[in-house]
């Protein structure tokens, strides 16, 4: 089987002053602190979370 594609997501802006649902999306992606990078699977669910908090994160394919 072929491996699923992954996206590297980095938190580049602080969560202070953001709305609770946006903080929940960042936590759902597995990001804990500034400049923390994680690799998530390229699924519609993860893409939706990334789109919702696009102003807080940087992504690379």
From Swiss-Prot:
GO terms for molecular function: structural constituent of ribosome. GO terms for biological process: translation. It holds the Pfam family Ribosomal_L30. Keywords: Ribonucleoprotein, Ribosomal protein. One of its GO terms (cellular component) is cytosolic large ribosomal subunit. Belongs to the universal ribosomal protein uL30 family. Part of the 50S ribosomal subunit. This is Large ribosomal subunit protein uL30. It comes from Thiobacillus denitrificans (strain ATCC 25259 / T1). The lineage of its organism: Bacteria, Pseudomonadati, Pseudomonadota, Betaproteobacteria, Nitrosomonadales.
């Amino acid at each position: 089987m072929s491996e699923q594609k992954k996206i590297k997501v980095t938190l580049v802006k602080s969560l202070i002053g953001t709305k609770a649902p946006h903080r929940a999306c960042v936590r759902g992606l597995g990001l804990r602190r500034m400049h923390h990078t994680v690799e998530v699977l390229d699924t519609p669910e993860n893409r939706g979370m990334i789109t919702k908090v696009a102003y807080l994160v940087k992504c690379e394919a």
